[in-house]
Amino acid sequence: MANKLHPIKSIEARTQSYVLDHFEKSKYAKRLRKLKDTHLGEMCFIIGNGPSLSTDDLEVLHKNNVLSFGFNRIFLMFDKTNWRPDFYVSQDKKMLCDCQDNVNKLNIKAKFISIINKYYYNIDIKDALYFNVHSSIQGVPIFSDSIDLYIGKSSTVAFSAAQIAVYMGLKKNISFRCRS
C-alpha cells in the first residue's frame, strides 16, 4: 500500500507551494507593499552581532533616536542597554527554532521573517512580516529592490536587512559591527 498524503496536509502543501511561486499575489506581499518608501531619505543603522558590538554604541543610537535594524540573537543585549532595534530580521531556522519565544516577545515596529521558516519548519512569529527568498545566481547574491516579490539570499542576514531598508526608502544605510 502506497503512503497517501493526508487530504488537509495535501491542500496545505499545494497552497504553500502556490504562495511561494506567486508570492507577489499573497497577503504577505500586500503587507510588505505598505512599507514602500515609508522612510524615504532617512538614515538607518544595520546592527550586526559581531564581538566588537558595544552597549555604548547602542546607547548613542538610542539617545539620538536613529532608526536601526537588528537580527537573530540581538535581544541578548537588551538587559545591558535601553536601545532596541526598530526592525528585526531573521531567516535562520535553527536560531528561530531555539528562540521563537524571545522573538515573539519583541516589542518593536516590525519583525521580518523568511516565509520558508513558517511553512517548512512551523515557526510562527507573532505580527511577523513574512518575506520570500531567492537564492543567488551562479554564486552571486541578488539584491532585490522589490521585497514584495523576494529578498535575495546571502550568507548574512545583514544583506536581507539592507534590501528591506532600501525598499523602505532608507537611503543612507550604515552597516555597523557586521561580520561576513
Predicted regions and their residues:
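Glycine-rich anion-binding loop/nest that anchors nucleotide
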Residues: 45-51, 153-166, 171-180
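Short acidic/polar alpha-helix capping motifs at helix-coil junctions
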Residues: 17-25, 38-42, 126-129
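Short amphipathic alpha-helical segments, especially helix-boundary/capping motifs
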Residues: 8-9, 49-52, 135-140
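Intrinsically disordered, low-complexity segments enriched in small residues
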Residues: 25-68, 77-80, 84, 89-90, ...
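Acidic/Gly/His-enriched mid-domain segments of enzyme catalytic cores or analogous surface patches
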Residues: 22, 64-67, 73-166
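Short, mixed-charge, low-aromatic patches
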Residues: 12-14, 55-57, 117-122
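Membrane-proximal basic amphipathic "stem/tether" segments
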Residues: 1-33
